[in-house]
């Protein structure tokens, strides 16, 4: 590679470098000791010095120097790992610069010109290799060269970043370099002549954590299936851990969770991932989780600033977040103040004049005639310019038509109270295009229910109407006061005060609207007018597996509530669930969605319920609603760790917290709706829409804390489950205006003693007071940590189930079968790493049966066959692998699963001789052997085998053995014993038989009994050729049985004949085998097996025990080397073709 020119004195390097060639201005040198074998003492000393110091010259032992005539100062301008690489640079210099330099008179001009050219080349090379995105591109380029030379990965394996650190081997630290690439974690150490290389694929990492040991307080521990590795002594351990966490998460989800995982656009191409991309992704995910925004929202800028907060009459310090469609603000102090400004609501963004009190201010005005003042903004001009550009784009894509009549109507319906200003309507949130569009929408979807179901099916509570209304009015009054001070639209100030109001329970008349506000579903609703109605029409009447599942669960959704004892509620629920399944087929429909949607329909209109469901499924509970509920399982593991941290006594008593975590699955999936009375559970949903998943975590901890004493005294998991069920069933809501609606899993005790009742408001208040200290950032970090474990847990489950299915059907030892599965999966993964992107669904499909989830193609199978097959045939191995793949590919989809792969190996290693011969036989007839088979194409029309061999041979002791009688008797016996129920294999033609013999011949190569095997196969081949000729003549005359004996008796011994005739010579009677006659020549499996059984050496060869363990050990070592060699050879071939 090209180097940034730096001046050196050549006389100081005379002993270390040897000049290979030179010109007027350039010198090409080789590091002394490189390529000299074990020769000279000086070379060995320099090599030892480089090894001890881990010098760059060990990796790049060639360099080119710029020399200016008359100067003793030289400048290295290029280095290379090989002579070919450095010669390419030398040739470029000769062709492009050497003649140009001769026109310069001033030597300083020569140096400046060359250095400028080299720097331009470096910039171009840097741009192509993404190094310009690193903080120190020169050092990164050097590290990149070392990484490529030390680990010999294909070019597709891109280095992301590197760090100096120690890897602990027992109690001994090894100082070296940690290289983090897109698919692997690599460590290299070379000290005092001892080299250590460590390569760990990210997909093999089962645990990534920060730990402490006896020697060091802070280390990073990597846990794989078999080993633990500790890394320490980083300059910035926090940064390293975050990058490793991001890389592991991206790679694991890209390769193992492709069912629902969508990469950010910047990470779509793995080979383009850089450290900055990972940092941006982490910041993006925190931003979306903190403000609960759509997953496609991309963060553009984070700026420190201060916001004028009228309720506190001062400026509040914090940070502004600017994204595609939002301007958000969060105060430095957690919970103090937060705002979300959709750009759809923004009217203008203006710069104000700077003053000493208001430095660098801007004003953001929204449609409800409220302005937000930000000050102390760095780079204000560029920020405002970018915000205005995005504002213009949002308004162009989603024009807003404000309808005051609709707003007045909604404001009077929902908020019968005074407001901050006359135009500050809650109805702004609806953003209806116009009254005409609203009417046309109703005409378009006449079946859509116009109101929330709770208004049509209002129940009378046990309390008096006056008492119920008075409590509701008090809450409404408190909320109205809050709206006056903090705002009532989606752009309201969100403070600790509103959290307290939410914890008390939102009034029923405001509940649906505030859910829309807190989740920001109102923005989706306003941005997609008519979208839901179109979905309903498109999905109406369609029948599929998803609609059948929905129909099955419709009547299980809040059956106690009168709204869902009526076709009106059932029909609305059906439309919303079917429309969502039509919108998002990746999720489709999952159980528990029906319970959540039914509650949403109680308090919101049908279309609003749909957008709330979108918000919950796609951003508030990511990855919850899919076939494997990965997101819910991750949060269960997070919840388990939170129990250990906040309730240590309970965790100590219950050694296995997985039981509590499994009980909590329904808490997370249904937001407590399925295990708590409805009038209490809706208060939980209130908190969820305001605080997100944090509210569910802290409420779960509060439930366990309230029952900790009883749980500690419980004897088993069943009793603990009953304790929690009884407690949750007796949570009441004293402020609920409606009658109690029981939970789906109410617990009834035989005891007559009344169980104490817990008020939901008290429980929620306790959860905030005792467990409300968890931040979004902490929860996201825990999710990263546990997502690795959950995904690897799924992989382990898949592996165990595959082995459970396959073990009874094969004779391979379970531990060897496990090793084979790991090799099979690793082969699949390596193709995902370095080959061109292919549709992942055709490879790893979690919805398929366990044994068929990982599948490999013909090329991958050939690699594995070469590594683990006992039938090594030299150059013929690849051809045999192709035929084996075609045989195993029953459905002709060019993919095979693990079960088929193992069943084939089982026959090769553990099968009886007849099974092995049958497999070989099938490999040489269609479909395994095709007309286009590359090894079966021969320019000769005549057979390659002689058929004039005798049927009488001499034994070593001089006795003669007549095979005629034996052969005839064997054929008769086989005909009698043949299993009529088994499908008969087609007979083998002469061409196919020739290929069969070639395979046997190549299998015997380098065997200890090679000579005996060749003599035996010569005998067997002659027998079979004679049988084929007899059958051929018999078929032409119609009396095969009579002619068989005559033909055999007519055979004359001829010791000079060879089994494999010289292909360069054609027998004189070659014309006796025309094409038609060749087609008539056939032998059967029974003939081949009977003939092979006549030779003891062949029987011994096929029945000798084979060692699979040694093969597997070699395969584990060589699998990566074989793949990288093939990839590098392929890339070199492509390079040569491109040069041509």
UniProtKB/Swiss-Prot annotation:
Domain comment quoted from the record: The arginine and glutamine fingers are critical for the GTPase-activating mechanism, they pull out Rab's 'switch 2' glutamine and insert in Rab's active site.
Role according to the record: May act as a GTPase-activating protein for Rab family protein(s).
UniProt GO BP: blood circulation; positive regulation of cell population proliferation
Encoding gene, per UniProt annotation: TBC1D8
GO CC entries: membrane
Domain Rab-GAP TBC: from-to ranges: 505-692
Amino acid composition bias (Low complexity), ranges on this chain: 1032-1043
Protein name: TBC1 domain family member 8
Region (Disordered): 1031-1070
Record's keyword terms, sorted: GTPase activation, Repeat
UniProt-listed PROSITE patterns: TBC_RABGAP
Residues carrying the site annotation Arginine finger: 552
InterPro entries for the chain: EF-hand-dom_pair, GRAM, PH-like_dom_sf, Rab-GAP-TBC_dom, Rab-GAP_TBC_sf, TBC1D8_PH-GRAM1, TBC1D8_PH-GRAM2
């Amino acid at each position: 590679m090209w180097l940034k020119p730096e001046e050196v004195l050549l006389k100081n390097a005379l002993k270390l470098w040897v000049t290979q060639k030179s010109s007027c201005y350039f010198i090409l040198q080789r590091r002394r000791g490189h390529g000299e074998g074990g020769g000279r003492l000086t070379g060995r000393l320099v090599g030892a010095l480089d090894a001890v110091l881990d010098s760059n010259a060990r990796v790049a032992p060639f360099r080119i120097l710029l020399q200016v005539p008359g100067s003793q100062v030289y400048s290295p301008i290029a280095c290379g790992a090989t002579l070919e690489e450095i010669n390419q640079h030398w040739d470029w210099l000769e062709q492009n610069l050497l003649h140009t330099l001769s026109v310069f008179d001033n030597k300083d001009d020569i140096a400046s010109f060359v250095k400028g050219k080299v720097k331009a080349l470096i910039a171009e090379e840097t741009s192509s290799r993404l190094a310009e995105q690193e903080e120190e591109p020169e050092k990164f380029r050097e590290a990149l060269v070392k990484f490529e030379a030390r680990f010999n990965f294909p070019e597709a394996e891109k280095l992301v970043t590197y760090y100096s650190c120690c890897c602990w081997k027992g109690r001994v630290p090894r100082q070296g370099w940690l290289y983090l690439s897109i698919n692997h974690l690599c460590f290299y150490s070379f000290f005092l002549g001892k080299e250590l290389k460590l390569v760990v694929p990210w997909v093999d990492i089962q645990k990534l954590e920060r730990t402490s040991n006896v020697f060091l307080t802070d280390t990073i521990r990597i846990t794989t299936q078999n080993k633990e590795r500790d890394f320490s002594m980083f300059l910035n351990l926090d940064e390293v851990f975050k990058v490793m966490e991001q890389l592991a998460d991206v790679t694991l989800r890209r390769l193992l969770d492709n069912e629902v995982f969508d990469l950010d656009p910047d990470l779509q191409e793995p080979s383009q991932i850089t450290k900055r991309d990972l940092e941006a992704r982490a910041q993006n995910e925190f931003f979306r989780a903190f403000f609960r925004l759509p997953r496609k929202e991309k963060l553009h800028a984070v700026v420190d600033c201060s916001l004028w907060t009228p309720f506190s009459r001062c400026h509040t310090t914090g940070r502004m977040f600017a994204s595609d469609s939002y301007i958000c603000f969060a105060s430095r102090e957690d919970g103090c103040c937060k705002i979300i400004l959709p750009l759809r609501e923004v009217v203008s963004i203006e710069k104000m004049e700077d003053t000493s009190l208001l430095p660098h201010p801007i004003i953001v005005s929204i449609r409800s005639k409220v302005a937000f003042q930000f000050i102390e903004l760095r780079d204000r001009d560029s920020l405002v310019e970018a915000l205005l550009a995005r504002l213009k784009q949002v308004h162009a894509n989603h024009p807003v038509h404000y309808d005051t009549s609709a707003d007045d109507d909604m404001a009077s319906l929902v908020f019968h109270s005074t407001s901050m200003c006359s135009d500050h309507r809650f109805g702004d949130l609806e953003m209806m295009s116009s009254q005409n569009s609203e009417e046309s929408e109703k005409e378009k979807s006449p079946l859509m229910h116009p109101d929330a179901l709770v208004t049509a099916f209002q129940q009378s509570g046990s309390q008096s109407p006056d008492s119920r209304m008075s409590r509701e009015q008090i809450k409404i009054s408190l909320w109205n006061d809050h709206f006056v001070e903090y705002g009532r639209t989606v752009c309201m100030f969100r403070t600790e005060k509103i959290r307290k109001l939410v914890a008390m329970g939102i009034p029923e008349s405001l509940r649906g609207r505030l859910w829309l506000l807190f989740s920001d579903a109102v923005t989706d609703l306003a941005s997609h007018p008519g979208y839901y109605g179109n979905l309903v029409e498109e999905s109406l009447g369609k029948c599929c597996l998803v609609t059948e599942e929905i129909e099955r669960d419709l009547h299980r959704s809040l059956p106690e509530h009168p709204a869902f004892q009526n076709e009106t509620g059932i029909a609305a629920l059906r439309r919303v669930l079917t429309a969502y399944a039509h919108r998002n087929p990746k999720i489709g429909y999952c159980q528990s969605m029906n319970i959540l949607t039914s509650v949403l329909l109680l308090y919101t209109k049908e279309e609003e319920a749909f957008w709330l469901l979108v918000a919950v499924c796609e951003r508030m509970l990511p990855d919850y609603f899919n076939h494997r509920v990965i997101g819910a399982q991750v949060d269960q593991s997070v919840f388990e760790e939170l129990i250990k941290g906040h309730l240590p006594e309970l965790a100590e008593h219950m050694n296995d917290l997985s039981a509590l975590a499994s009980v909590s699955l329904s808490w997370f999936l249904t937001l407590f709706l399925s295990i708590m009375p409805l009038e209490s559970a809706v208060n939980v949903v209130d908190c969820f829409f305001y605080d997100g998943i944090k509210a569910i975590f802290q409420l779960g901890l509060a439930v366990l804390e309230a029952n900790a004493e009883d749980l500690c005294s419980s004897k088993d998991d069943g009793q603990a489950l009953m304790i929690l069920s009884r407690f949750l069933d007796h949570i009441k809501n004293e402020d609920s205006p409606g009658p109690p609606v029981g939970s789906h899993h109410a617990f009834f005790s035989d005891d007559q003693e009344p169980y104490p009742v817990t008020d939901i408001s008290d429980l929620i208040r306790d959860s905030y007071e005792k467990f409300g200290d968890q931040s979004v950032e902490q929860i996201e970090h825990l999710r990263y940590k546990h997502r690795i474990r959950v995904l690897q847990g799924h992989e382990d489950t898949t592996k165990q189930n595959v082995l459970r299915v396959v073990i009874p059907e094969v004779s391979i030892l379970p531990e060897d079968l496990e090793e084979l599965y790991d090799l099979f999966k690793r082969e699949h993964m390596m193709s995902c790493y370095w080959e061109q992107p292919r549709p992942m669904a055709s490879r790893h499909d979690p919805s398929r049966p366990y044994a068929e989830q990982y599948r490999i193609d013909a090329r991958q199978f050939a690699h594995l066959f070469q590594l683990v097959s006992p039938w090594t045939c030299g150059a013929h191995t690849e051809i045999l692998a192709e035929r084996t793949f075609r045989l195993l590919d029953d459905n002709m989809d060019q993919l095979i699963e693990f079960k088929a792969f193992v069943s084939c190996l089982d026959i090769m290693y553990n099968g009886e001789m007849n099974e092995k011969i049958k497999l070989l036989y099938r490999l040489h007839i269609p479909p395994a052997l095709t007309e286009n088979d590359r090894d079966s194409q021969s320019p000769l029309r005549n057979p390659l085998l002689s058929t004039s061999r005798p049927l009488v041979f001499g034994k070593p002791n001089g006795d003669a053995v007549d095979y005629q009688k034996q052969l005839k008797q064997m054929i008769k016996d086989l005909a009698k014993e043949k299993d009529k129920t088994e499908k008969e294999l087609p007979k083998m033609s002469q061409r196919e038989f020739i290929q069969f013999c070639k395979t046997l011949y190549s299998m015997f190569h380098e065997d200890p009994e090679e000579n005996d095997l060749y003599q035996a196969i010569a005998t067997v081949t002659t027998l079979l050729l004679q049988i084929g000729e007899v059958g051929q003549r018999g078929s032409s005359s119609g009396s095969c049985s009579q002619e068989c004996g005559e033909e055999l008796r007519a055979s004359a011994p001829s010791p000079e004949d060879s089994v494999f005739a010289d292909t360069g010579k054609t027998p004189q009677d070659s014309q006796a085998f025309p094409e038609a006659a060749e087609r008539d020549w056939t032998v059967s499996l029974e003939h081949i097996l009977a003939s092979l059984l006549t030779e003891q050496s062949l029987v011994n060869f096929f029945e000798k025990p084979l060692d699979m363990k040694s093969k597997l050990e070699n395969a584990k070592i060589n699998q990566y080397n074989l793949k990288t060699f093939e990839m590098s050879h392929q890339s070199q071939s492509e390079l040569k073709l491109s040069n041509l």
